[in-house]
Every structure is written in C-alpha cells, then in structure tokens.
C-alpha cells in the first residue's frame, strides 16, 4: 500500500469510499459494549484515512492505528488527532494489551507486504492472540474468490465533485489472485487557478486465501 495509496488515491478513498469504515465502527462499538468493554483500547490495522478511528474515539475508545501509506496516515492524523496513528506495516505493529484488534477493508489480503503471502499472517495472528484481553475481539474481513463474475477484466467508474476513479479488476482463479489497476482523476489548485491531474496507481494485488485457516 505504500505505493498504491499515494496522495490522490488516499484523497479519493477517503472522500468516496468511507461507508464501510463507518458501518464497521458502529458494529464494533456495539460488540464491545456487549462484551462489557465500552471504553476498551482498539488497535486498528490498516487504519486508512481514520474514519473508523474517529468514530471509535467519539464512542470513548482509545485507538492505536497502523497503516503503510504515508498519505493515508496524513489524512488520518487530521481527522482523528486523538488517536495514536503510526506509519508502518501491520505485520510489524506493536500490539499492547487491548480490547479489540480490527483489520477492516480486506487489508489482510493485500500483497504489498511480502509477508502476507508467507508466514507473516500466522505470526501476526499469534501476536494478536497474546495481546487481546480476556473476552477481547478480533474483527476482520478478507477478499473472497469469485469477486469477478463473467469476462475478466472488469471495469468500473466512479466520480465525486472534484475526483473520479477508473478501476480495472482481473481475477486469476488458479492463482487465487485479484489484481486492481486504478487510474485517478482529481481537480487540484495550480497557481491560484483550477487544474486537474490524472495518475495511475501501480496495480495492487490481493490474495483471497491470505488469511490463515483457523479451526
């Protein structure tokens, strides 16, 4: 994610793709309330632009967030200044005792970190187990096979007031790999006048089989 989520893509992701983070925050706050941890610390892996972290802070939870994208962390620090937000791979994240560890938005499936495809996730899950307080929660989602139906690749277009994004998705069922090629368009100020730029993020891949199997 350090390459794929540069300044423009981080801006667009924050502006137009925050619904999942907001919904997840509502769910996690309720789960922690039911678990008797209404003020418990939350460690958010792949914290993105801080939408989730801000909602947890507003609900009274201390938050530590990790993200490998400097652009995402910069946005998150503006949105959630009360959170402890750290730049780096979640595979190396410090995990203090906590009520919950979260990894929302399929971040455990991304292959930007080489360790995700190897034994890195096994070690991470073991450390999460050690960090969670009794009754603590691990909340995450992963990419599932079959995302692309019909002819591959598939293209989609989405736009907002000052941005647009073109996404091309290709799935290799044999290799269990999903690849996204993303082109962003964003209106930006230039010398006091309106301007625009287009950027193509490096293709990002995720592995639907990345999360360790647990019986």
Regions found by a protein language model. Give the residues of each.
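Conserved class I S-adenosyl-L-methionine
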Residues: 1-37, 51
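Nucleotide donor/acceptor-binding cores
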Residues: 40
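Class I SAM-dependent methyltransferase SAM/SAH-binding core
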Residues: 43, 49-93
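Short glycine-rich, flexible loops that bind phosphorylated cofactors or substrates
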Residues: 93, 109-111, 147
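A short glycine-rich, Lys/Arg-flanked "PGG" loop and its adjoining helix->strand segment in the class I
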Residues: 119-134
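A short SAM/SAH-binding and catalytic strip from SAM-dependent methyltransferases
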Residues: 99-119
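SAM-dependent methyltransferase
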Residues: 139-214
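Non-membrane alpha-helical structural segments and their capping/turn regions in soluble enzymes
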Residues: 22, 70, 118-122
């Amino acid at each position: 994610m350090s390459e794929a989520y540069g300044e423009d893509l981080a801006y667009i992701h924050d502006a137009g793709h925050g619904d999942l983070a907001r919904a997840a925050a509502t769910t996690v706050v309720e789960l922690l309330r039911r678990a008797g941890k209404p003020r418990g610390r939350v460690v958010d892996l792949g914290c993105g632009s801080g939408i989730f972290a801000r909602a947890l802070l507003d609900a009274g939870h201390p938050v530590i967030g990790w993200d490998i994208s400097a652009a995402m962390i910069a946005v998150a620090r503006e949105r959630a200044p009360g959170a402890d937000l750290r730049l780096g791979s979640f595979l190396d994240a410090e995990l203090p005792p906590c009520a919950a560890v979260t990894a929302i938005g399929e971040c455990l499936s991304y292959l930007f970190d080489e360790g995700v495809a190897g034994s890195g996730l096994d070690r991470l899950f073991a450390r999460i187990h050690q960090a969670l307080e009794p009754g603590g929660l691990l909340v995450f989602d992963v990419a599932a096979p079959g995302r692309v139906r019909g002819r591959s690749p598939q293209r989609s277009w989405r736009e907002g007031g000052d941005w647009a994004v073109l996404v091309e998705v290709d799935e290799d069922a044999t290799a269990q790999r999903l690849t996204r090629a993303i082109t962003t368009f964003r209106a930006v100020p230039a010398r006091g006048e309106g301007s625009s730029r287009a950027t193509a993020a490096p293709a990002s891949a995720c592995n639907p089989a990345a999360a360790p199997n647990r019986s």
